[in-house]
Protein backbone atom coordinates (compact mmCIF):
# COMPACT_ATOMS: atom_id res chain seq x y z
CA UNK A 1 0.00 0.00 0.00
CA UNK A 2 0.99 3.59 -0.52
CA UNK A 3 0.74 6.42 2.02
CA UNK A 4 -0.33 9.88 0.94
CA UNK A 5 -0.31 12.89 3.22
CA UNK A 6 -2.53 15.94 3.27
CA UNK A 7 -0.90 19.28 4.14
CA UNK A 8 -1.46 19.21 7.92
CA UNK A 9 0.42 15.96 8.62
CA UNK A 10 3.35 16.99 6.41
CA UNK A 11 3.64 20.35 8.14
CA UNK A 12 3.19 18.82 11.60
CA UNK A 13 5.90 16.20 11.03
CA UNK A 14 8.34 18.91 9.91
CA UNK A 15 7.65 20.86 13.13
CA UNK A 16 8.68 17.95 15.39
CA UNK A 17 12.15 17.21 16.70
CA UNK A 18 14.10 14.64 14.70
CA UNK A 19 13.73 11.79 17.20
CA UNK A 20 9.95 12.14 17.49
CA UNK A 21 9.55 12.60 13.73
CA UNK A 22 11.55 9.42 13.04
CA UNK A 23 9.50 7.40 15.56
CA UNK A 24 6.26 8.59 13.99
CA UNK A 25 7.51 7.85 10.47
CA UNK A 26 8.51 4.32 11.53
CA UNK A 27 5.03 3.71 12.93
CA UNK A 28 3.43 5.21 9.81
CA UNK A 29 5.39 2.74 7.65
CA UNK A 30 3.68 -0.08 9.57
CA UNK A 31 0.37 1.49 8.65
CA UNK A 32 1.02 0.37 5.06
CA UNK A 33 0.46 -3.17 6.35
CA UNK A 34 -2.48 -2.00 8.47
CA UNK A 35 -0.52 -2.80 11.65
CA UNK A 36 -0.72 -0.98 14.96
CA UNK A 37 -3.39 0.24 17.37
CA UNK A 38 -6.04 1.04 14.75
CA UNK A 39 -9.74 1.71 15.37
CA UNK A 40 -12.55 2.68 13.03
CA UNK A 41 -14.06 6.11 13.72
CA UNK A 42 -17.74 5.73 14.55
CA UNK A 43 -20.11 7.26 12.04
CA UNK A 44 -17.36 7.92 9.49
CA UNK A 45 -17.07 5.13 6.93
CA UNK A 46 -13.52 4.60 5.68
CA UNK A 47 -12.01 6.76 8.49
CA UNK A 48 -9.71 5.30 11.12
CA UNK A 49 -7.38 6.46 13.85
CA UNK A 50 -3.98 5.10 14.74
CA UNK A 51 -2.45 5.56 18.20
CA UNK A 52 1.28 6.26 18.16
CA UNK A 53 2.64 7.07 21.61
CA UNK A 54 0.64 10.13 22.72
CA UNK A 55 -0.23 11.09 19.14
CA UNK A 56 -3.31 10.24 17.10
CA UNK A 57 -3.24 9.83 13.33
CA UNK A 58 -6.49 10.24 11.44
CA UNK A 59 -6.49 8.46 8.11
CA UNK A 60 -8.79 7.28 5.38
CA UNK A 61 -8.71 3.94 3.63
CA UNK A 62 -11.27 2.50 1.25
CA UNK A 63 -11.37 -1.29 1.27
CA UNK A 64 -9.70 -2.61 -1.84
CA UNK A 65 -7.78 0.62 -2.46
CA UNK A 66 -3.99 0.65 -2.51
CA UNK A 67 -3.73 4.15 -1.01
CA UNK A 68 -4.05 5.26 2.61
CA UNK A 69 -4.49 9.02 3.03
CA UNK A 70 -3.10 10.47 6.27
CA UNK A 71 -5.44 13.36 7.06
CA UNK A 72 -4.25 14.66 10.41
CA UNK A 73 -1.65 14.06 13.14
CA UNK A 74 -2.31 15.59 16.55
CA UNK A 75 -1.32 15.13 20.19
CA UNK A 76 -3.87 12.97 22.00
CA UNK A 77 -5.60 15.81 23.88
CA UNK A 78 -6.12 17.94 20.79
CA UNK A 79 -7.29 15.03 18.67
CA UNK A 80 -10.28 14.32 20.88
CA UNK A 81 -11.20 17.99 21.39
CA UNK A 82 -11.21 19.30 17.87
CA UNK A 83 -9.78 16.91 15.31
CA UNK A 84 -11.52 16.46 11.96
CA UNK A 85 -12.91 13.08 13.00
CA UNK A 86 -15.82 14.73 14.83
Residue ranges and their predicted role:
Residues 2-4, 22, 52, 60-86:
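Enriched for short, Lys/Arg-rich terminal
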Residues 15, 39-42, 50, 61-62, ...:
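Short histidine-centered beta-strand/loop micro-motifs
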Residues 1-22, 27:
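Arg/Lys-rich, positively charged N-terminal/basic patches that mediate binding to nucleic acids
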Residues 12, 47-49, 58:
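Short aromatic/hydrophobic contact patches that present stacked aromatics
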Residues 26-51:
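A short, surface-exposed loop/turn module that caps and links secondary-structure elements
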